């Protein structure tokens, strides 16, 4: 999940990743859409970051792949090797596990999707940073599309708008493209335990907020252990103002 701010005065686009394990209002933030829909998801994110959200776009991972293929692929630079022994890949009948060495890579849609989705190679924060890196590659590629590439541009925009959940029309998307294509991208920003978050175990029972208890003998409390079933993230000392302040600081830089 990425909060994006466009500053027309500084001509800068700031990307800030919100971790999916952030625990807010009794549930993880990534569960809100499935339960309540996009409007409630937007409302929760507004409350978390302390910023008004004017537009939203929900992109299916396979649409993400198709858009990159329509653009002819994207270029990214990995700062470190990406190794995920749990991520199985198969290409032209040859199967292996995910591995990309550090350096420059030209990625088609499938490769970009693999790099964006890999969860067991590094931390979830590194995954968020890689997703932003791919978005930067998409922006760089899009900057080279102009009036002469009108057919390709319209194909990309139509695929994006028709295959996603968004309140942005094709006409608006086209205006945004030409208005913002040369803005600087401020990426690599992730709300994390490196700044304002703590890792907090919470019970799975959303209704009672009681830990799960397992007893060898229910009549003997000393045989009981409490198990926290979900690892979550919350602001330090449960101070949600820290997240809002962190976001505002990034936007003010």
Model-predicted segments: where are they?
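Non-catalytic, solvent-exposed segments at the cell envelope interface
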Residues: 1-253
């Amino acid at each position: 999940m990425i909060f994006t701010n466009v500053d027309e005065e500084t001509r800068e686009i700031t990307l800030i990743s919100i971790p999916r394990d952030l625990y807010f209002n009794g549930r993880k933030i990534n569960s809100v859409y499935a339960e309540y829909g996009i409007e409630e998801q937007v409302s929760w994110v507004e409350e978390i970051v302390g910023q008004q959200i004017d537009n939203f776009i929900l992109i299916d991972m396979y649409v993400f792949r198709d858009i990159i293929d329509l653009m002819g692929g994207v270029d990214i630079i990995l700062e470190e090797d990406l190794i995920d022994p749990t991520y199985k890949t198969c290409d032209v009948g040859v199967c292996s596990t995910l591995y990309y060495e550090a350096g420059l890579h030209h990625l088609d849609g499938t490769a970009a999707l693999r790099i964006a989705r890999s969860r067991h190679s590094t931390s979830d924060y590194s995954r968020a940073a890689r997703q932003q890196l791919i978005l930067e590659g998409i922006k760089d590629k899009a900057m080279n599309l102009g009036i002469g590439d009108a057919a390709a541009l319209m194909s990309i925009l139509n695929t994006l708008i028709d295959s996603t959940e968004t309140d942005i029309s094709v006409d608006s998307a086209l205006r945004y493209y030409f208005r913002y294509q040369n803005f600087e991208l401020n990426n690599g920003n992730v709300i994390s335990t490196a700044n304002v978050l703590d890792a907090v175990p919470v019970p799975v029972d959303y209704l009672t907020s009681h830990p799960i208890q397992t007893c060898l003998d229910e009549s003997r409390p000393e045989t009981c252990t409490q198990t926290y079933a979900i690892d979550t993230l919350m602001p330090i000392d449960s101070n949600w103002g820290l997240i809002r302040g962190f976001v505002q600081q990034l936007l003010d830089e």
